[in-house]
């Protein structure tokens, strides 16, 4: 499963996110990747839409898909230096786990991991 979801206002794309079930092997350090989960990737919001709840809308859509499919959690990672998402995820109820490195990225580049359980 992998689809790109967007938030559009008029003819302007305000933000988008790939909503997948893809869990890279690197995630084994944090999660049991044999468990199905929703995994949003590439969450991006146009600067003109910052602070307008666009990222929240996209993550709420991910939650809806998670519930529809009967999965128990949403798992995300973000660059440890991405201040906005490292504030956003806990604010939306995501539990902060531990930083990991990702294959193909510099070893000194850390990615924070988060998980949210849905009912």
What would you call each of these model-derived segments?
Residues 1-48, 59-60, 117-119:
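Acetyl-CoA-dependent GNAT
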Residues 14, 83-84:
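Short alpha-helical
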Residues 45, 51-64, 87-91:
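Conserved acetyl-CoA-binding loop-helix of GNAT-fold acetyltransferases
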Residues 59, 66-78:
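Conserved GNAT acetyl-CoA-binding A-motif
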Residues 77-78, 90-110:
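Conserved catalytic-core motifs of GNAT/GCN5-like acyltransferases
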């Amino acid at each position: 499963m992998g689809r790109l979801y967007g938030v559009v206002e008029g003819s302007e794309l305000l933000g988008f996110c790939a909503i997948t079930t893809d869990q890279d092997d690197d995630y084994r350090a944090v999660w049991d990747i044999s468990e199905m989960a929703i995994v949003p990737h590439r969450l991006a919001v146009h600067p003109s839409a910052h602070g307008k709840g666009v990222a929240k809308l996209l993550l709420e859509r991910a939650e809806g898909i998670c519930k529809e499919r009967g999965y128990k959690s949403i798992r995300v990672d973000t660059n440890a230096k991405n201040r906005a998402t490292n504030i956003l995820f806990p604010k939306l109820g995501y539990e902060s786990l531990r930083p990991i490195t990702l294959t193909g990225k510099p070893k000194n580049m850390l990615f924070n991991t988060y998980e949210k359980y849905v009912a």
